[in-house]
């Protein structure tokens, strides 16, 4: 190797080192998944009267009793683990679990069938997917329709990160199609293999005098997983795309299009739909970040039992 080639090699290494040194990562609060709130809920006698454990990402603490949960310790994380009170009956659902990983913990998100037996006779079966997201749930859940309205989706956020970074592991159910199981009638087939989803959206929101919320899409990152991993994938880094990305080769209409199905709590304390009305310019500053990890895709009551997504060490890259 000549002197010129040696010099160029050193210059390249120096450039790479400088670029790496300039990269900044910020762990989301409680994003290391090492700290959890554990709740003990007593279900109604008519459905068995069992004590059930629910997990929430937050400060290490145990809560005993059928009390509505509000995020503790400044935790930005909500889960699909909920307590419901419908027609005077208290019932729980837990799809997100605290699981040991090395010297700490991670989150395990599962899709399963929640089975309820009333007076030991009537069976009600509902498909439930694991969801870990930035925001919170409004408890208790008081109805079986339009479950999204209980979710306050997104948190205030005004930065412009380059990427989302996290550790993950995925186990597919192996089924070629999904099912829809609402608790009323039997299950139906939904064509297409189930996928886990990781979604980060940056939005510039606006609330009108009536409390309605609209948003322009500032940043977009959506990845899906349908093949099992043999082991943990550490430091998965997913680029955030800014502005109108519809002509980008990375744009996937099905998962990245503008959304109108999410809810957020307005200034009046009411959960209302967030309607994305367009794409912001690529240099716009957001007001909110939406981040969700999901063990299944396709909407409420849809998925494949057995789909499992593990998540740990959630960071933003600048």
Spans of model-derived segments:
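A short beta-strand element within beta-rich, extracytoplasmic domains
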Residues: 160-170
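Interfacial segments of alpha-helical transmembrane regions
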Residues: 182-188
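Extended, low-complexity, turn-rich repeat/linker tracts enriched in Gly/Pro/Ser/Thr and Asp/Glu
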Residues: 170-177, 188-193
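A short secondary-structure junction signal
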Residues: 176-181, 211-212
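Aromatic (Trp/Tyr/Phe) and Gly/Pro-enriched flexible surface segments
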Residues: 22-159, 191-205, 209-243, 253-297, ...
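Sparse recognition of residues in long alpha-helices and their boundaries
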Residues: 49, 181-182
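Bacterial Sec-dependent N-terminal signal peptides
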Residues: 1-27
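Substrate-binding/catalytic groove segments of enzymes
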Residues: 176, 245-252
């Amino acid at each position: 190797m000549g002197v010129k080639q040696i010099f160029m090699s050193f210059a390249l290494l120096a450039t790479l080192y400088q670029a790496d040194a300039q990269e900044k990562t910020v762990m989301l609060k409680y994003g290391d998944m090492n700290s959890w709130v554990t709740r003990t809920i007593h279900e109604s006698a008519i459905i068995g009267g069992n004590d059930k454990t629910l997990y929430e990402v937050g400060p290490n603490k145990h809560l005993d009793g059928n009390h509505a949960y509000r995020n503790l310790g400044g935790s930005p994380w909500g889960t699909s683990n909920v307590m419901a009170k419908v027609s005077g009956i208290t019932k729980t659902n837990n799809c997100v679990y605290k699981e040991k990983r090395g010297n700490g913990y991670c989150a395990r998100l599962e899709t399963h069938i929640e089975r309820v037996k009333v007076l030991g006779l009537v069976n009600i079966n509902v498909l439930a997917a694991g969801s870990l997201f930035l925001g919170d749930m409004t408890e208790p859940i008081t109805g079986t329709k339009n479950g999204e309205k209980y979710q306050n989706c997104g948190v205030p956020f005004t930065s412009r990160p380059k990427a989302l970074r996290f550790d993950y592991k995925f186990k597919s159910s192996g089924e070629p199609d999904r099912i829809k199981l609402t608790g009323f009638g039997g299950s139906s087939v939904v064509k297409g293999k189930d996928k886990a989803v990781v979604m980060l959206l940056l939005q510039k929101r606006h609330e009108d005098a009536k409390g309605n919320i609209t948003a322009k899409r500032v940043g977009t990152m959506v990845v899906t997983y349908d093949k099992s991993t043999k082991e943990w994938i550490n430091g998965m880094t997913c680029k955030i795309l800014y502005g109108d990305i519809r002509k980008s080769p990375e744009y996937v209409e099905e998962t990245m299009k503008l959304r109108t199905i999410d809810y957020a709590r307005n200034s009046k304390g009411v959960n209302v739909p967030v309607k994305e009305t367009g794409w912001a310019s690529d240099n716009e500053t957001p007001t909110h970040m939406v981040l969700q990890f999901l063990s299944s895709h396709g909407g409420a009551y849809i998925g494949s039992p057995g789909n499992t997504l593990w998540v740990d060490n959630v960071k933003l890259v600048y």
